[in-house]
A protein has these predicted regions:
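Conserved micro-motifs of the catalytic ATP-binding
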Residues: 43, 76-83, 118-121
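Short alpha-helical segment of the dimerization/phosphotransfer core of two-component systems
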Residues: 53-61
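Conserved catalytic submotifs in the C-terminal HATPase_c
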Residues: 83-84, 103, 108-118
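Short helix-loop "hinge" at the ATP-lid/N-box region of the Bergerat-fold HATPase_c
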Residues: 137-138
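Short beta-strand/loop element within the Bergerat-fold HATPase_c
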Residues: 144-156
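Short conserved segment of the HATPase_c
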Residues: 169-183
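Conserved glycine-rich
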Residues: 210-211
Length: 232
């Protein structure tokens, strides 16, 4: 019986991986064509808005397939490239990439970091973790708000915090935000392009690197994600 279950789970994982991989190319084509069409000055404002909606949803689908593929690969016990990483530098790169998105809501992102923030890790996954945390802070942050990223060394650990002054999370939802596809506000998630996988992936990445993460939040005040990794 257990062998049949394991076979079934393996087939499910393989199916998820295959579907996610096959979706990437057509979704990329849709994104490319939408961006091309939006450059056409002869389109009406109504046409451009409709194309923009398609583009937003296509980008959301692209993010979803990428995250599903990453999760499927993890469940297949794929090897990860562990190397010496400068966590501070990687965080700077993520913040730089997300500045345009933050500016759309006039959100200021500040980074406060100590030196010597080195750890062993998979660079792609650590970048994804920080991307998800800061993107989440932007999506649920208030217009004209602030996001503070704080990185320090404490007891041979890298301690990081991503703190926003956004809408916050009610206590009833705090324990469930790590679940796959769990969304507190589905309409807001769709509007922001959320997939429901971001925080689930964050926790998996943290656990993979022998770290810990927890969340502190007060409704209408803001949210802080605090994580720790072994330092080298």
């Amino acid at each position: 019986m257990f062998e049949r279950l394991e076979f079934s789970f393996e087939k499910e994982r393989q199916f998820t991986s295959d579907v996610s991989h096959e979706l990437r190319t057509p979704v990329a084509v849709i994104i490319s064509q939408c961006e091309y069409l939006l450059e056409n000055e002869n389109l009406s404002a109504e046409d451009k808005e409709e194309i923009a909606v398609i583009l937003r949803q296509a980008k959301r689908m692209s993010k979803l397939t990428s995250e599903m593929l990453m999760i499927a690969r993890n469940e297949q016990d794929e090897q990860h490239l562990m190397e010496k990483l400068d966590f501070g530098l990687l965080s700077e790169l993520v913040i730089e990439e997300l500045q345009t998105k933050a500016q759309e809501k006039n959100i200021e992102i500040t980074l406060q970091k100590q030196d010597d923030l080195f750890m062993n890790g998979d660079q792609t996954l650590i970048l994804r973790m920080m991307m998800n945390l800061i993107t989440n802070a932007i999506n649920y942050g208030k217009t004209n708000g602030h996001i503070h990223v704080i990185l320090k060394v404490e007891n041979d650990q890298i301690v990081g915090e991503v703190k926003d002054d956004g809408i916050g999370i009610s206590e009833e939802h705090l324990d469930r935000i790590w679940e796959r596809f769990y969304r507190i506000d589905k309409s807001r998630s769709r509007e922001n392009g959320g997939t429901g996988l971001g925080l689930s992936m964050v926790r998996w990445i943290v656990n993979l690197h022998n770290g810990t993460i927890h969340v502190e939040s007060i409704e209408d005040i803001g949210t802080s994600f605090i994580f720790r990794f072994p330092k080298i």
